[in-house]
A protein has these predicted regions:
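Interfacial "coupling" helices/loops that link adjacent transmembrane helices in transporter permeases
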Residues: 102-119
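Transmembrane alpha-helices and adjacent helix-loop boundaries
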Residues: 96-101, 127-131, 201
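Transmembrane helix boundary and interhelical loop/hinge segments in multi-pass membrane proteins
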Residues: 90-107
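Membrane-interface helix-boundary motifs at transmembrane edges
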Residues: 15-16, 191-201, 266-271
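Aromatic- and glycine-rich beta-strand/loop motifs that create alpha-glucan
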Residues: 1-27
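Secretory targeting signals
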Residues: 32-93, 117-196, 232-251
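Central hydrophobic cores of alpha-helical transmembrane segments
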Residues: 25-29, 199-215, 275-277
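Junction motif at the cytosolic side of a transmembrane helix
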Residues: 253-277
Length: 277
């Protein structure tokens, strides 16, 4: 455990140093996505108060499948960016560090699996920091903008107009945020595993294709559907049960990906057959 903590500390220092520029870029993109809606709402709804959900809802809710069927879809660029934010942030860091420094660190730790786990722990930490920073800054600017309200507005209800269930205002915000964070975790783990086996660009394309297909199909096998609040329930009649099951299944899938990656690295000759992208 001490060895894992030391590796995690190393990855936190090295990882944030290597990914700082990309982190700043995706934070700016995320903020622009939300603050654009804040500006738009204050301009178009000048006589109405704006709720926090009004700002994040368009991005975090996903796309109603009814709009896809009607071919009146507004492509969810923001949702895709947030789902892929972990993969964008990590980029080639995991693969390059494993392949460039594996021989030295493997000898010291006597476990390539711990090195792999520490990399994924760094990913999870970076994702949480990203979401906390984005949401905190958005909330701060929202409060400063004035005309705020802490309940579901007419505009907020219009975002959920295709849903057949009713949540409280706080449930809507919490569930939508949790689902998006869970989706970012899962797609980052998928990307990290694939990038060990294939070129980074191919791994990224696979993740994009899964999300893209999820937008245009409500097939539950397409993982992106599970991370759109508007597409629930998927696994049961109750949306709360459905979301809870999703939040349970995601850690389970992440653990499977972690184990598969560890097995692959253990069997792969990291010293003699490496290729840094």
């Amino acid at each position: 455990m001490i060895g894992l903590l030391l590796l995690f500390k190393r990855d936190m220092i090295l990882g944030f140093h290597r990914t700082a520029k990309i982190f700043i870029i995706i934070v700016i993109l995320g903020l622009f996505n939300f603050l654009y809606y804040l500006y738009f709402l204050h301009i178009s709804l000048s006589k109405s108060n704006v709720a926090f959900w009004d700002i994040i809802g368009k991005t975090f809710t996903g796309v109603p499948f009814e709009l896809v069927e009607q071919q009146t879809i507004e492509f969810p660029f923001g949702w895709i960016i947030f789902q892929l934010s972990g993969a964008i942030l990590v980029n080639t860091f995991i693969k390059e560090d494993l392949f460039a420094h594996s021989a030295f660190i493997r000898v010291r730790t006597k476990s390539i699996f711990k090195l792999w786990v520490s990399k994924l722990l760094f990913c999870c930490t970076a994702i949480l920091i990203f979401y906390i920073l984005i949401l905190s800054l958005t909330c701060f600017v929202w409060k400063l903008s004035g005309g705020t309200v802490n309940n579901l507005t007419d505009y907020g209800e219009s975002i959920l107009r295709y849903s057949s269930f009713q949540f409280s205002y706080s449930q809507i915000i919490v569930y939508s945020i949790l689902l998006n964070i869970a989706g970012t975790f899962l797609f980052t783990f998928i990307f990290a595993l694939l990038s060990l086996i294939f070129k980074t660009i191919y791994s990224f394309i696979v993740c994009i294709c899964i999300l893209f297909l999820s937008i245009f199909s409500d097939n539950p096998m397409l993982l992106g559907n599970a991370f759109m609040l508007i597409r629930h329930p998927m696994f049961g009649l109750s949306p709360v049960v459905s979301i809870t099951m999703t939040l349970i299944i995601v850690p389970f899938l992440c653990i499977i990906l972690l184990i598969v990656g560890g097995i692959y690295l253990s069997k792969y000759d990291l010293i003699s057959n490496t290729e840094i992208e």
